[in-house]
Amino acid sequence: MLIKMVEKQILKLSKLCEHWAAHNNSHKESYVKWRDVAREVLNLPTVVEKLNKAIEMMDKSTEYLLSAKKELDL
């Protein structure tokens, strides 16, 4: 019984990691869109730099989430 409960929690956490990674990607698309607006329309180079950093961090977060999922799926 306890083993089944642990397996169920591992499966849930794996699915959450996958969901969070996908959610990050949808946010990233929006960040990229608005970074481009900040660059091309609004001419806000410091905002562009900060959005680029946020995009990099989002990519890193997604990488960690997918790595955790892979470990859970072993």
Name every feature range the model reports, one short phrase each.
Residues 33-74:
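Short, charge-rich amphipathic interface segments used for partner binding and complex assembly
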